[in-house]
Amino acid sequence: MLAHAGYRRARTFFTPANAQSYDRLARSATFGRDMAWKREIVRAVGNANPVLELACGTGILSSMLASAGRHVVGLDLTFDYLRATQRKLELPLAQGTAEVLPYRDSSFGGMVSSYLAKYVDIDRLTDECWRVLRPGGVAVFHDFAYPSDPAVQGLWNLYFSILRLCGKFASSWKVVFEQLDDVIRESRWESRIQASLHSRGFTKICCNYHTFGTAVIVRAEKP
């Protein structure tokens, strides 16, 4: 049973109460950048097929991958988010965690995730990715990051202070708005996942920062 802090936090953040408003929030809270980052993920995974999306949520990225001709399989921790995906798309879905995947070895040509890495046990994630990917398979991870530029940090901190105030008027997102900035600051997931991927045997590992360093995409291949 998973009991680490990231798992508990994800359970607290993503609930039946906010599943229906997630898509709208993802667009507005990122000023539309969410779609731009997801387009980069689709480009990064290339022609890999089939593609497993971890933490598929309400199916935003899965829809984009399917439109690009990928055969998509989705997995998410929260049942109500999977139901939202099911209303949009016909694709195989499963409820579960990224650290214990319910799939056979070498099942996928690609694996993607968006907004997952800061919540998981990184080493268990990369172990499972290695197991379910075929040789030549591609893994793409995307999530928020704390910017390194002091000027951008100032704006970032101001934005999240405003977001905390907004939580007073959006009860289903209150906990997220109050805690997300601390989660992002403490995570530093991009450096940890690159080290873990390298240790596990992945090659061609690359890390690209986006939107003034506030988001990161890490890509790797299984030789």
Label every PLM stretch briefly.
Residues 200-223:
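Core SAM-dependent methyltransferase catalytic element
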Residues 123-138:
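A short glycine-rich, Lys/Arg-flanked "PGG" loop and its adjoining helix->strand segment in the class I
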Residues 6-9, 145-196:
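C-terminal alpha-helical "lid/dimerization" subdomain adjacent to the S-adenosyl-L-methionine
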Residues 110-123:
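A short SAM/SAH-binding and catalytic strip from SAM-dependent methyltransferases
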Residues 1-46, 60-61, 176-178:
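Conserved class I S-adenosyl-L-methionine
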Residues 99-111:
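A short acidic, Gly/Pro-enriched loop at the edge of an enzyme's catalytic core
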Residues 52-100:
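Class I SAM-dependent methyltransferase SAM/SAH-binding core
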